[in-house]
């Protein structure tokens, strides 16, 4: 096995849409190894758990739900030998480790066990052998935050666990961005190493991949070229698993915004730092229903961003402009957005790639990616009797994990029931 690592990092950017700004994050990763899965290289002897230690409930839970059914270790007591000694890392707290363990089981393991053709056997064959959790992020030399590392399809390290907030599914610090996009992405690599993706996928975006410069690229400009994320534009293998992971974890609003943005042509120009700083506070000036909300999304005419190199850029849709740079309106006061000027409709390219992922999962693993997406998001968001996602009064999807049913307000939430599974093992504890 080689030592190639797959590093997930967050590079921060500030974006401005008209008069509003928002904080966005793009996933940054380095190359993955193509190691084959083989026999266990770890000590597989069983050791009895110490019932007198404080961590006995979680130790028992992960043994019963990770190790025994799937030969998967969930290591939350941070191991220096398994961590990057060049970084000042902090262990995950016991409480946050409990939260992540029950969520990984509920939102990842249980989903694949339910939908894969071989059920539980599928995960025992193909899941990573180790999930290692760390409380803090690691910081890279370019200032980005490392939130995950994957090694050879065997070990996945999830960082920043002490920031876990079950009440936040979306966003830069949401469950999906920090943890579950990583899990689906890396699992996609393992499956791709087992049964290679269709060769037709590798030719769709030939000539557009940039292994060295992808990190400085704008999300929307890359979307217009047919990539779901800038990292997906680094190489075909990453494009493949990013397409899979984004489709599964993006809710309907975010996926629709991505496709809408991808349909248009975009341009990026340098922007003065002083203008950038002057516009930044305006994100917080719109109030809806008494709540402070940022209104920016990718489906707008333009936004500001700060690159990983601390350069300031204006990213905007291509429209006719006058000599002063203002949008040129026609006689009726309208303007026309440019599409397919480069003969690429990013929306159609993304959907073409998704169709190949869909067929590959179905043919090789008997997994319907649309059912997978519905199952994952149906566990994250409240649905009505017809399976439609429910929105709150602000138009946001309702978090199912923390939802309190008005008809049964005294009943525990789903997340409370999940953590109670761990608490049940306290009954088996002893004291010295």
Model-found features: residue ranges?
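Metalloprotease/metallohydrolase-associated module, dominated by Zn2+-dependent proteases
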Residues: 209-432
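Auxiliary, metal-adjacent structural segments of Zn-dependent hydrolase domains
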Residues: 98-156
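Active-site recognition of the HExxH zinc-binding catalytic motif
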Residues: 170-198, 241
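Acidic/polar, low-complexity intrinsically disordered N-terminal segments immediately downstream
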Residues: 4-6, 32-117, 121-124, 339-432
